[in-house]
Amino acid sequence: MISSLSFLVLVPCALAQQAPWGRADIPVSSHDRVYAADQTSNTVSVIDPANNKLLGVIRLGDPVPGALSPLYKGQLLVHGLGHSPDSKILAVVSVGSNSVTLIDTSTNKVKGTIYVGRSPHEAFFTPDGRELWITVRGENYVSVIDPALMKEMRRIQMADGPGMTAFGPDGRYGFVCSSFNPELAVVDVASHRIVKRLPQASPFCPNIAVTPENDEVWITLKDTGRVQVYSATPPFEQRALLETGPITNHINFANNRNGKFAYVTIGGINVVKAFRRGAAPQLVATIPVGDLPHGIWPSGDGSRIYVAFENGGAAAAIDTLTNKVVAEIPIGQTTQALVYVPNAVPNGQGTENLSPLGEAGNSAHLHLESAGTSFPDAQASVSVNSLGLLDLVEIAAEGLAPAVQYDVYITDSNRPPFGKREPLAILKTNADGAGIVQVIGPLKVLAASGSAAPTSSPQRFLIVTNRDDASQIVLRQTSASSNQ
């Protein structure tokens, strides 16, 4: 069910500005593309938003575990995305191979790859398109790339663990949040100097965006389930601190005749929340979506918001006038970032150099429910992603105790006494009582009721226990599973 309040403020469509460049509306067409960064399959999924169909994937590497070979030369952990203001270049950040790959959007062809420091996270072009800033989260700097030369030109020193950069549409300031330190840096773009350091309400910011009117900066705080809002102009004061929910992931904006809105993906409870922007941001809709929503981006006219499901193997289109999901599209595995690029393909079909989804489309989706009275609202989504002979299982839990370790087991039954237990993983929760863990192994038995499972193997189940007291079961798998 969608909970919403009445939309009372009307804004003429002709005056609308859209993120990220603050431009006037560009109607949705078959020239546009939606791109999703698929971290496990090491692909970029390519969607035509005119009909909400998957066109194929750009393969940048092999799936895990093949990508872990010492002789492997492809990209690893495809994660972050950015696009040039002229829509001609897609920048793809691969965390594991320390790289950013530039792709021609009209042909889906790789133009080249630039290698940077340890564990880069996200990429963003300056509004004039002359520079590409990469946050090198595994170190302490932003790598400034000349996209024409495909070469690093300079580094901007930051606090340890810069998470993401966003620019105001006027190009004067860049804003860099941190994933390891409670600090947001304001950078003068022309001089590449930090002009202000602002306090973050908590250390882990994975995502940041500037409003298309260039008046506010919004950041997500994944560790505490909040969104922090600042002024985008001096003195850059804090304007709001919003309680949003566990595993608050990404944020973006859409303007339409109903008003100006911010959309936030809340991974722990599988919703997108819409806030009316203003002096006191107001929650106006809570939109149920697929498992572990992550990346989010508006269409060029703000009529839709696209969101990727990290544990769902799909992306969804949301109508921003009704705040209802109008389409779901299959994509690759454990998707992180998503971007919408208007007029990415000015001419032709734009399907060159694409491959079918293939094995990456073979996944199952499970649910864990509370198994006792200690945490009655606890739950988790689980994806079982086929990697061929092996599988990657990702568990995203919420509603547990904060900053605690739990044991994950495979069992013979999902009911007491659960039968034989085999240890699978350790789940660590953050300050908000939420946590995500991944494990690789021959785990299709978790989805024995679905097409991904071997027919000769009985189904096994997942339970989560208190690490200090293994008899305390906090989560157990329900019987049902869904498959793609």
Where would I find each of the regions flagged by the language model?
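Short, flexible loop/turn segments at beta-strand junctions in immunoglobulin-like
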Residues: 397-400
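Predominantly soluble domains enriched in secretory-pathway, periplasmic, or organellar proteins
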Residues: 13-378, 388, 402, 419-423, ...
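Short beta-strand segments enriched for Tyr within beta-sheet-rich domains
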Residues: 404-410
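Short beta-strand elements
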Residues: 470-484
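Structural beta-strand segments of beta-rich domains
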Residues: 389-395
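Extended, polar beta-sheet/loop recognition surfaces of beta-rich domains
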Residues: 412-457
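Internal, hydrophobic beta-strand segments that form the core of beta-sheet-rich folds
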Residues: 454-469
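Bacterial N-terminal signal peptides
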Residues: 2-14
